[in-house]
Amino acid sequence: MGELLSETADGVIVNVRAAPRSSRAGLDGMVGDALKVRIRSAPVDGKANKELIEVLADAFGLPKSAVEFKSGETSKTKRLLLRGVTKETILSRL
């Protein structure tokens, strides 16, 4: 999948490994070259993806509209664009 963070003109693309059906929601360290994010929802009808966007937006102080899927919507391994932030901002909050 490449590196954890890729800076673009629009923001930063983050590699994420989703852990659905977790007992708690939030960031949970690294798994290989991806950020592990725990989410409570099951991966049914897009509920887990919606919660994933909420968790990332909250963790990095962004509005939900600033978090967008680039790939992997039906996979545990995903790439999301975080608009309006830099690599340094994200790394400082990990």
Model-identified regions with their sequence ranges:
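Contiguous, often N-terminal, cationic amphipathic patches that form binding interfaces
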Residues: 1-54, 59-64, 68-73, 78-94
